[in-house]
């Protein structure tokens, strides 16, 4: 993923205008950046898979497995969540918990209390369950290793370019919207899996579904469609009443 980040930075450095230009031109340059990154990642991954084919079934399977592995982040999700949990529950260390949360979210965490640190952690894990686990698997099953890696490139561009600030307001808009589209179906699959998990754990899954259907059209401070969906779905399953005290800087 570091290589994808470097590739994004390379194209951004070459396509981001040095002088002020029109909003439309900024958007087109950002869109071109996205398309070039996706094309490059797709071609390189396809070439790698082709080499695997030449080496036989076992080499192809090994390369495909490695590609899928690098597009998923289940361990980091669990590690980050548990670390913040223990900082709050065992150590009562709000300062370190705020700092640790700031590493995994694009939000202002400096003044959060214990309750809102917990909420922020749950929201982030709920969202990242989609883009760190379900979406890569979804596109791997549909389009193979190339699909999973192209998805990861699109998601990484959203995290690097999809900010609502002066630099990326128009340049990063295409990247942000593309990420919404890519995660539209996987986000809903994740919700169904959350409901299934709640059912198996004998939690109140019916209430979670009711709240989800009730609030599905409720706008949140974040314009990021997938983020809003997964925050609501995941937190509902976990019986957390979200408060919009966090300041979102993502689309």
Label for each model-derived stretch:
Residues 1-149, 162-251:
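Hydrophobic alpha-helical transmembrane segments
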Residues 153, 157, 161:
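Active-site His/Glu-centered metal-binding helix of metallohydrolases
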């Amino acid at each position: 993923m570091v290589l994808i980040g470097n590739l994004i930075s390379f194209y951004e450095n070459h396509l981001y205008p040095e002088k002020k230009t029109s909003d439309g031109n900024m958007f087109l340059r950002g869109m071109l950046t996205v398309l070039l990154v996706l094309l490059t990642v797709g071609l390189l991954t396809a070439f790698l898979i082709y080499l695997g084919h030449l080496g036989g079934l076992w080499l192809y399977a090994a390369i495909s497995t490695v590609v899928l592995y690098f597009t998923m982040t289940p361990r980091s999700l669990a590690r980050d969540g548990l670390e913040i949990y223990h900082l709050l529950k065992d150590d009562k260390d709000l300062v370190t918990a705020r700092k640790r949360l700031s590493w995994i979210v694009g939000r202002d965490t400096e003044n959060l209390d214990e309750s809102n640190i917990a909420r922020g952690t749950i929201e982030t894990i709920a969202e990242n369950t989609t883009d760190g686990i379900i979406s890569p698997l979804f596109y791997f099953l549909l389009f193979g290793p190339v699909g999973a890696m192209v998805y990861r490139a699109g998601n990484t561009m959203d995290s690097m370019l999809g900010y609502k600030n002066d630099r990326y307001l128009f340049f990063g808009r295409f990247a942000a919207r593309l990420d919404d589209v890519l995660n539209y179906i996987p986000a809903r699959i994740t919700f169904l899996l959350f409901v299934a998990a709640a059912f198996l754990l004998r939690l109140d899954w019916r209430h979670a579904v009711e709240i989800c259907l009730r609030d599905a059209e409720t706008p949140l401070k974040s314009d990021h469609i997938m983020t809003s969906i997964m925050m609501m779905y995941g937190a509902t399953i976990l019986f957390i009443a979200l408060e919009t005290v966090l300041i979102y800087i993502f689309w």
